Amino acid sequence: MVNVQSAECNYKGVIDNIKKWQDKEEFKKLFTEKAHILWEKDLRDMTLNEVYQTIAYMIRDLVSEDWIRTNEIYAEQKVKQVYYFSIEFLIGRLLESNLLGIDMDDICRQGLEDLGWDLNKVIPAERDPGLGNGGLGRLAACFIDSLAALQLPGHGNSIRYQYGLFNQRIVDNQQVELPDNWLVNGYPWEVKKVDKAVYVRFGGNAYMRPDEDGNLECVHEKYSSVRAVPYDVPIIGYHNNTVNTLRLWRAEYSREQLYQELSIGDRRRAFRYKDSVQQISRFLYPDDSNEDGRRLRLMQEYFFVSAGLQSIVRHYKKKYHESIYKFDRYVAIHINDTHPALVIPELMRILMDEEGISWDAAWNITVRTVAYTNHTILPEAMEKWSIPMFKELLPRIYLIVEEINNRWLKEVRSLYPGDESRARDVAVLWDGQVHMAHLAVLGSHSVNGVAEIHSQILKDSTLHQFYTCFPHRFSNKTNGISHRRWLIEANPQLASLIDDTIGDSWRRTPSKLQDLMPFADDPAFQEQLTRVKKDRKEILARYIRDRYDTDVRTDSIFDIQIKRIHLYKRQTLNILHILHLYYLLKDNPKLKITPRTFLFGGKAAAGYGEAKETIRLINVIAHMVNSDRKVNKQMKVLFLENYNVSLGQLLFPAADVSEQISTAGKEASGTGNMKFMMNGAITLGTMDGANVEIHRKVGDENCVIFGLRADEVMNYYIHGGYSSWQMYSDDAAIRRLMDALVDGSIGGDHFGMLYSAFLDRNDEYFVLKDFQPYCQAQQEIAKRYGDHTKWCHSSVVNIAQSGYFSSDRTIQQYADDIWRIKPVKH
């Protein structure tokens, strides 16, 4: 074991100048004062939520000066700043991460203990903010965390949703969606900035007319105004004085417009206006299976884009005092997928209509300012809006999009005369729809994918025609995760072991986790790592016992798949293997297998029938397995409801096996794979997304890869040759599983939608094709787990190589290659 004193010098000296409470006595004094002001009650009568909120306000007080100073320095030095637009930010709880960020967790813990509270019980009193749902939002959260940690001038921009996606409950084995009223007790981290409110226009009529000088100007009349009020959340840099901002917009009705409607006696119209406005920031991802839902989603997207851009332009003019023609030298705008793609026509609108710039100049500024990250390969997931709805809701924006499309198609047709198929493939407006991905590519100077295989598919297939036109715009930026959240905070036991082994400089420079490689075969280190994993499995087992009244064996393989429920992510492949394993045990009572605990988590979109049926299938099989005494000593199955960031912080550190089994070529990147890896789990996966790069980092011997490759999948799509009915006919195990879906043998239940997806619709995601390879991969997992020394070796290698997948690396690449921003020390 390395003597840490002789290892590379740790960095703790660099945090001496950050503001902090001097000791626990000062903490207790300030806590008491703040609590009396906030709650006006005896400390002994405070609830855990009140204790949490008190500490949150204390932290805000502590960082407020740095928050102000950070923004002052950016303006004084006229540094270029990036604004990261995302429809969601899945930030998770902030109390613990902020305490770690300001290096005050120990003082807070000790002070609370003296006052009679346990910090570990206070932390869960904070609700997970309902500001995001899946990987898109969690990536955005990790990115703004890294921006602040690296002291880069960057901020987030999104919507302050009153309700999150939904709280998931499992009732009678089925997902039930309940309101996620996460703001019910307020949110102490936010600061309402009424003076920064702006107005966003919807509807009305827009047309062009000549002005006094004969130039065309736009007239937009009879529109509805929505007041956008920002709520700012501090994003605290890790052990530095940088405090960036996540700005969240809330929609409010315009009092002037409401009074105007009431003054003409149209009360019904007035209240309809008021309700429609309040809906804009009420729900994350409203159901878009109907016209009203799609209309609301489009309103949400334009609302936060317009509000954010107006705020940015106003700040630029007020603080930078530079020509609007230099805007792109000082401002970078990044759009996280296509939800914020309306940034492009909205910036054009502001530059032309409000700043008086010509079309060509405005377009050049816009393209140089905006960059776009694509997150999807699935054609059905590419965002499109019907032209009539778009035109009615956003008439001025539609005129701009129409002009962008006309100019672009004129250029394409001049380069490729007579090639209408090419024009169709790259048009922004086509077949009655607005194609947002096409708009995003056209209006951005940079287009990136989020894993090497994903970026290559974009160039070769999904956006191939654009790549041939703008090859210089395309690049790859493999996703990353915040090691502060997913290792330091989520797994303090492992973080401490790493500190004791190689020093703590990896906390600042995660690539230094590679210094663990020499310890991969060190018996003493393996023993300590085993103890840490056992402790984390016991913590999760206690949670499962308390929440689900179910005991799980901590000496079993914890095999975990946690992600959004979708057919391409293939939770179905996992649960069919579990059913197959169950049948093997039932058919062979003397058969002994490596004990397993299979854990699932994730939400299905409320309107996605096959995904909801997948959840029902998992729960029915779980009940069947767990209640069978002849089987449940060797395997358990659980679906953990309401998966979120906080639950993830319990699951990732406890995992032995990371299930990353999407159909090859369908997952853009994935970041759960990185979180598992960083906590020492072994990847069981396809060659998809970032799995490809994880495999390259750790090698065949330290992960288990199976299944079709992306080119094989694409070949089947293009040329055919795959028949799921043939798989059914040729494989008795598959036939038994498919029949069980509809013959009532699984808990007396029927799963017709999944049966139809596998057989009647020819198994679009190749679950049956990959079934036997997956079973063999699971056997390989069991074999490797049986050799404890080799398993520990693989676990150490995964941890050591995971530093590459820190979002700090990703963000540094964005900063250097796309945004051209520099760190600002202070």
Model region roles, listed by residue range:
Residues 2-826:
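A conserved ligand/cofactor-binding region detector
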